Amino acid sequence: MTTQFSVAGIELELFRYPASQESNLQAWDAADEHLINTLVEGGQTAVPTAIINDSFGALSCALSRLNPDWPLNVETDARTSFLGAEQNHHRNQLPMDNLTRFTSRDALPCDLALVLMKLPKNLTYFAHQLMRLSQVLPAGCKVLVGAKAKSINASLLEVFATHLGPASASLAWKKTRVITCISDGKPRALPKEVTWDIPEFNLHISNLSNVFAANKLDIGARIMLDNLPQGDFKTIVDLGCGNGVLGLRAAQLYPNADIHFIDDSEMAVASAKANWANNQLPAEKGHFHWDDCMTHLPDGVEPDLVLCNPPFHQGEAITDHIAWQMFLDARRRLKNGGILHIVGNRHLAYHVKLQRLFKNCTTVASNGKFVILQAQK
């Protein structure tokens, strides 16, 4: 794993968060380098700047290294991005008092003079971000977006024109391009939340824009809902909750249980919280945590059931280390006799990991693509 970042005379040591030993993963990519080179070559001075979708702080660390007084407004939906940026600022002895942090639902400041962005994987979320920017950016404000060259096409440039202003792409460098968009100063209305029903479970679901499977029940969740365990559970964790559908169904099946919803995405946690209220479930039984797995779950919470539909990517990176951390956290936090109940793609071979961690693993159900596994502490 490469940790030495060297671009445009800026030297940093950067790590992913949480730590990963996978040799092909690092805390930045060529699009970060391209953005920084574009800034430095353009002679950009320190003006109020928004940095959006900065995975682990490469952009904020680089600008802070250039000028410790550079006023930076850092926005991300991912808790691990905040924690990674904080870790990398401390590691490189960079100030934090020039940073103001925002989630993807917070109101952005109105004095921005420059925006740096990374193109997210979810283009519905990206369009939402552009609409939010349109509400605060003055006409003529420059927005620079770094992305893989293969992700940039006429349709993407049209997304800019529709939601923020005209845009053009640079020449390719290390298989990346920088898109320059000039705000037209016209505020756009934000889109309404996506809502849909699961009639067989009498659930009404709403999703914010960065939530997985935004307008339907994904296949993994479907097979999980049909195969939840029986038992008199008192404390349940929906780990990587997304819109909260597993925890919502658990609340119906185990009405005496406290349900804890945890996700790295702030929009996911907000969606789960809204869905809990919209389905008229008891307020005192639902608990919501924007967290890196169960890292900051209160000490007194000792679950007897953890439900998990683990992701196998972090941003653009395909990786199983998030699932591994989820399984480790479940083993650490479950009470003795407690159950980890997961769904995963067959080819990911999660049964090997669970057998290694728990010394037991049972196949509960399966189909051609997915498998439900259960391990007991």
Curated annotation (Swiss-Prot):
Main subcellular localisation: cytoplasm
GO-annotated molecular function: 23S rRNA (guanine(1835)-N(2))-methyltransferase activity; nucleic acid binding
Keywords carried by this UniProt record: Cytoplasm, Methyltransferase, rRNA processing, S-adenosyl-L-methionine, Transferase
Keyword tRNA processing in record: no
Entry EC no(s): 2.1.1.174
The UniProt record lists the keyword RNA-binding: no
Location within or outside the cell: Cytoplasm
Any one Gene Ontology cellular component term annotated for this protein: cytoplasm
Catalytic activities: guanosine(1835) in 23S rRNA + S-adenosyl-L-methionine = N(2)-methylguanosine(1835) in 23S rRNA + S-adenosyl-L-homocysteine + H(+)
Top EC class of this enzyme: transferase
Pfam families on file: MTS (PF05175)
Disulfide bonds: none
Family of the protein in this entry: Belongs to the methyltransferase superfamily. RlmG family.
Function, as annotated: Specifically methylates the guanine in position 1835 (m2G1835) of 23S rRNA.
Protein name as it appears in the record: Ribosomal RNA large subunit methyltransferase G
Species: Shewanella sp. (strain ANA-3)
Gene: rlmG
